[in-house]
Amino acid sequence: MRVTKLVLVVSVLALLISSVSPAAEIAIVDYADQWTKVDALRQTLDEFKIKYDDYTKNVEKGTLTFKDENRLFFIGSMTTNNPKLHESLDKNAKSIQDFAKKGGIVIEPTQADQNEANVDWLPDGLTCVRSDTDSADFKIIKPDHTVFAAPNKMNEKSFQKWGHQGWPTVWEVIASQKGFDVIMESLKKPVIMEAEYGKGKFVMMALAPDKYHIAGNDDNTKKMAGLFMENLLEAYLFSLPVEAEGKLATVWGHLKRFF
């Protein structure tokens, strides 16, 4: 009888855990641009063995529809080098904004200023204008931000001497912005910045950690960029909400009564 109860408890616990665990999934758009020639976001996620919904072909055809399970929309570095993707992202601005408003996170790392100087799919009140300036100098403004904390503790040294061909750590620094909180800067201009929107958030960067992880000039660049990709996913996707942890603890507390 006790064994039967134990089996029942384990089965119920598994069911309840699945119901309170975050059903977060990644949606991506990615492109092998003319400079790096690699679809680095895909390759990085495949290396990490992380499943994702690839909407690139749909976006090329002009549509962007998110699944209910999607929690993070990650646009690969230099994706807008593909003019069809650039134009379609702009045309689907409402879809992107609604995704964030409902609680989704949107991340866009480095884009070439000649392809996407102004990020036109951002909502009213938020602006991001990219430039052609690259820089090896930078400063972390918010060292306690979660993106530098887990699973890898990272500081300014972690980002030093990144490179791809002749480009340094900061690639296409953000020239101007409105409505964002700056997390890292270079030449007193934003490098990483984020803004809350509805229940979600927009994260813009002048870093290309996906490209640098796959196509960096040296092992240090590839390693550190990979560690930062892990941190991005942890900070903006995998972190378990406090309320979910509370529910799980409550469930376990009730089930212990069977023993």
Q: What is each residue range found by the language model?
A:
Residues 52-54, 127-131, 178-184:
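Short secondary-structure junctions
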Residues 79-166, 170-176, 221-230:
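A glycine-rich, often tryptophan-bearing local segment used as a flexible ligand/cofactor-contacting loop or short
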Residues 59-65, 136-139, 146, 191:
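A short acidic, often aromatic-flanked loop/helix-cap motif at beta-alpha or helix-coil junctions
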Residues 22-30, 35-36, 117, 179-181, ...:
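Extracellular ligand-binding/catalytic regions of CAZymes and related secreted enzymes
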Residues 25-120:
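Helical hinge/lid and interdomain linker segments adjacent to catalytic or ligand-binding clefts
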Residues 8-18:
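Bacterial N-terminal signal peptides
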Residues 1-9:
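Bacterial N-terminal signal peptides that target proteins for export
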Residues 65-69, 100-101, 174-178, 196-198:
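Flexible, charged surface loops at secondary-structure boundaries
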